[in-house]
């Protein structure tokens, strides 16, 4: 019953928005993308879901970064997307930046980043409202970013492309079949929806 209630809620919420995502194609230079990849170098750790390594849901490596230049880089894109897509969510901070590496067969199955509810408050009283993913390279196959329930597929994102979307929308990264896929993922938080 709980799952049915959640699915019904998602349908209602999704009907209330007209833009599911906002994309900039090839916006960041190859040099910036490489600089972001280099944040990982030798510090990769196995990605977790709810503080557990669950290979059936996610197979990737991550590095968290608190480099100020990264926050300065991503924030203007979020504010622009929030306005132009018409979401106009109350965003107060950028929360967490993660460089992710998907090797062959790496993936992240269907998931949401946040519901914007009181049930998932971070210790600062805010919750994830917008998610951003930046593709840092193009020399891989598979590893497509997909959103569930869209009648039109998300276009293939190439190196330097940025996608911003509401954190409550279900999405995934399909298995990488060749090469290594790198991305930068970050979240933007604000007070819970009323």
Regions found by a protein language model. Give the residues of each.
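Non-heme Fe(II)/2-oxoglutarate
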Residues: 4-100
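Catalytic core of non-heme Fe(II) oxygenases with the double-stranded beta-helix
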Residues: 75, 79-194
């Amino acid at each position: 019953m709980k799952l049915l209630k959640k699915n019904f809620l998602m349908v209602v919420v999704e009907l209330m928005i007209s833009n599911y995502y906002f994309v900039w194609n090839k916006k960041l230079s190859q040099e910036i993308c490489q600089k972001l990849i280099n944040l990982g170098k030798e510090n990769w750790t196995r990605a977790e879901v709810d503080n557990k390594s669950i290979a059936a849901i996610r197979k990737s490596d991550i590095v968290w970064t608190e480099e100020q230049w990264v926050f300065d880089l991503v924030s203007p894109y979020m504010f622009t997307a929030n306005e132009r897509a018409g979401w106009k969510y109350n965003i107060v901070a950028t929360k967490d930046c993660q460089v992710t590496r998907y090797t062959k067969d790496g993936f992240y199955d269907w998931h949401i980043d946040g519901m914007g509810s009181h049930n998932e408050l971070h210790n600062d009283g805010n919750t994830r409202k917008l998610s951003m993913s930046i593709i840092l390279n193009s020399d891989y196959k598979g590893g497509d970013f997909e959103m569930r329930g869209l009648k039109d597929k998300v276009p293939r994102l190439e190196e330097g492309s940025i996608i911003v979307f509401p954190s409550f929308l279900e999405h995934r990264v399909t298995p990488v079949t060749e090469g290594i896929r790198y991305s930068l993922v970050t979240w933007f938080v604000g007070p819970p929806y009323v």
